[in-house]
Amino acid sequence: MVLPLSQPHFSGALLLLVVSNLLLWEKASAIPACMAQKSGCWNPLVETFNSAMQTAGTLRTLADQFYVELYHNQFSSGQFLIFNSNLIRRDETVARAGTYCHSTLSNPPDRGTEHADAETEKYLKTLINYVGAWIGPLYHVVIELNVMQDVPETILSKVRQIEENKRKLLEDLRWILTKVYPTAEMKEEFPAWEHLSFLKSQGKHYKLLAMFNLSNCIYNETYHILFYLRELKCQITGEDC
């Protein structure tokens, strides 16, 4: 049927409405629907956020234990006390190791207008880079500890567990990104760890200085990760706001 010349405006509006509805359907279908179970409703997206937050809580505990172990185990305690003493004296090298974390280069905003106006997709991508920033350094620390002499199993096992949980958390975040933003392009950019050369050096002093940096940074960042996850869960699922 040929439409009269007086109808183009109406047909154009109808086409726009159809396209708009298709886009809304595509967005809704990208997010896992609630699945019925005997016990109630199960939402894969919410459950993945819960899994991520549980992993982040585990990381919090492991980071605490690792930090304490390094200060109390004979393998490292003496040198760590010296590092703290040098930190008070403002030794430049030790101060850098004790206060600077390379992961802050990808740290999401957590206060003020910048935080309130942050786009959720960008916020999620930034968190992926933030979480992933320590996976490479942890991998190298595990390798070095395996070849160092007299390394206690308690220290080695803690680093392994932290690395494993970091990878698990990163996979959860990647899954969330692909489900909520299926067409998003993600460029993972993990900043270089400047203390890697210290870790790879021959002297135990420098290896422990690298671990001094790693333990301080991971100890502090685990607090922030839980906050960021709660923010994202609220923004994306509307739960626990």
UniProtKB/Swiss-Prot annotation:
Entry protein name: Prolactin-8A9
Keywords (A to Z) from UniProt: Disulfide bond, Glycoprotein, Hormone, Secreted, Signal
Subcellular location: Secreted
Disulfide bonding pattern of the chain: C34-C41, C101-C217, C234-C241
Domain of life: Eukaryota
Entry GO MF terms: hormone activity
Chief localisation class: secreted
